[in-house]
C-alpha cells in the first residue's frame, strides 16, 4: 500500500514583498544607497507599495520620505525578483526606476545611513537587488552612454 502525496507537500512557499526602488546616480557616476535603522544591508531608496498605489507613485513618495527630495522618473528599468535583504525567507518583487533628483539628498524618516558608492565597491554590505540588478544595470547604462 502506497502513501499519497498531497499537492504542495514538501514545497516551501515564500512570502512576497512588492516594492518600488530607485537607481540614483551623482555626477561622479556613483550610486546612492541607504541603510534603514536596525538593518545591516545598504539598498536602493524605495519601499513597499501602499494598497492601490502605483509603483511610480510609491517611488516618488519614498524618495521624499527617505531622502527629502523631489524627483523625476527618467526611465522604468523593469520588474525584478530577488531575495529580500532584511526579511528571511521573503522574495522581493521590485519595480525599478532610473531617477533624477531635483536637489541634494539628506537622511530622513527611517534611514540610518546614506552614501554614494562606486560601482566596484566591495566594502559595503549590499542588498541582493543592489548587487544583482542596480549595479549591473548602471554599468551597462554607462558603457552604452560612452559609445
Where are these regions (language model features)?
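A short coil-to-beta-strand element that immediately follows conserved catalytic motifs
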Residues: 69-79
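Active-site-adjacent beta-strand/loop module that shapes the phosphate/pyrophosphate-binding cleft
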Residues: 81-105, 137
Amino acid at each position: 500500500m502506497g502513501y499519497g502525496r498531497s499537492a504542495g507537500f514538501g514545497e516551501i512557499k515564500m512570502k512576497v514583498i512588492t516594492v518600488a526602488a530607485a537607481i540614483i546616480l551623482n555626477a561622479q557616476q556613483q550610486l546612492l544607497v541607504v541603510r534603514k535603522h536596525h538593518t545591516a544591508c545598504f539598498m536602493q531608496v524605495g519601499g513597499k507599495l501602499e494598497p492601490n498605489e502605483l509603483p511610480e507613485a510609491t517611488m516618488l513618495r519614498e524618495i521624499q520620505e527617505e531622502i527629502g527630495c523631489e524627483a523625476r522618473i527618467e526611465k522604468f528599468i523593469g520588474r525584478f525578483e530577488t531575495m529580500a535583504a532584511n526579511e528571511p525567507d521573503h522574495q522581493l518583487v521590485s519595480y525599478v526606476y532610473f531617477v533624477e533628483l531635483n536637489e541634494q539628498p539628506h537622511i530622513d524618516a527611517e534611514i540610518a545611513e546614506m552614501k554614494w558608492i562606486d560601482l566596484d565597491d566591495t566594502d559595503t554590505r549590499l542588498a541582493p537587488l543592489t548587487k544583482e540588478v542596480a549595479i549591473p544595470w548602471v554599468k551597462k547604462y554607462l558603457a552604452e552612454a560612452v559609445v
